[in-house]
């Protein structure tokens, strides 16, 4: 061995790195979108908005038999700690402002699951009800629809799985574009303050407040 070769050997005693089996089992190559989506789909914290019997089936999904929390879906009592809204039951005109206000308080990115026929199309109230909203998607955007009257807990779990698949395929760049252009025509609601209607006089006509005079008796 020449002197120059011996010097190079002493200066670089470590050989070129090789991908071994141990290294391949402990190193994961991924991208930022995959890590971000994996964290979000594993922690879909729902905020329930239940107004009718479908909400009972949703509560059964969190029972010990189905245990929906094993998917990382832990119910939250405040919209500021949630990223998923599940609407179950009929949405009335009176409930609509409260529903939109709660939806606006959920931080982005946020998702909505419509559970049951009443919240999707107003159900049996869609024919002649003057107060039922014909679908919650008239107020807020809906990502997953779960039909049924009421849907079984297995259907609720299937809806959560479908939403997880949708989240897994998203990109942060797409999310930024959707946030700028609004993914739904009615996302940004601006409620106008109105005078209170619960004044106690809403059952009486304004003409009943004035005394009635018979024109034949007036001299």
Swiss-Prot record:
A GO term, aspect molecular function: quinone binding
GO-annotated biological processes: aerobic respiration; electron transport coupled proton transport; photosynthesis, light reaction
Protein role: NDH-1 shuttles electrons from an unknown electron donor, via FMN and iron-sulfur (Fe-S) centers, to quinones in the respiratory and/or the photosynthetic chain. The immediate electron acceptor for the enzyme in this species is believed to be plastoquinone. Couples the redox reaction to proton translocation, and thus conserves the redox energy in a proton gradient. Cyanobacterial NDH-1 also plays a role in inorganic carbon-concentration.
Record note on cofactor: Binds 1 [4Fe-4S] cluster.
Annotated binding of [4Fe-4S] cluster, by residue: 53-54, 118, 149
Protein's recorded name: NAD(P)H-quinone oxidoreductase subunit K 2
EC number, as in UniProt: 7.1.1.-
């Amino acid at each position: 061995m020449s002197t120059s070769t011996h010097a190079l050997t002493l200066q670089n005693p470590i050989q070129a790195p090789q991908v071994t089996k141990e290294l391949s089992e402990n190193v994961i190559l991924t991208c930022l979108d995959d890590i971000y989506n994996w964290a979000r789909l594993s922690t879909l914290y729902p905020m329930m908005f239940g107004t009718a019997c479908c909400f009972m089936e949703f509560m059964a999904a969190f029972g010990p038999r189905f245990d929906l929390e094993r998917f990382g879906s832990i119910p939250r009592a405040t919209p500021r700690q949630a990223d998923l809204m599940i609407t179950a039951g009929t949405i009335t005109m009176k409930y609509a402002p409260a529903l939109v206000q709660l939806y606006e308080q959920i931080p982005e990115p946020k998702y909505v699951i419509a559970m049951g026929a009443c919240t999707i199309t107003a159900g049996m109230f869609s024919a002649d009800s003057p107060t039922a909203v014909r679908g919650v998607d008239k107020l807020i955007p809906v990502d997953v629809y779960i039909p049924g009257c009421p849907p079984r807990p297995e259907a609720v779990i299937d809806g959560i799985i479908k939403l997880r698949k949708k989240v897994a395929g998203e990109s942060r760049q797409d999310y930024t574009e959707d946030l700028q252009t609004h993914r739904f025509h009615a996302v940004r609601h601006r409620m106008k303050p109105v005078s209170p209607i619960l004044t106690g006089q809403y059952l009486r006509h304004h003409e009943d407040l004035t005394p009635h005079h018979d024109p034949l008796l007036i001299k």
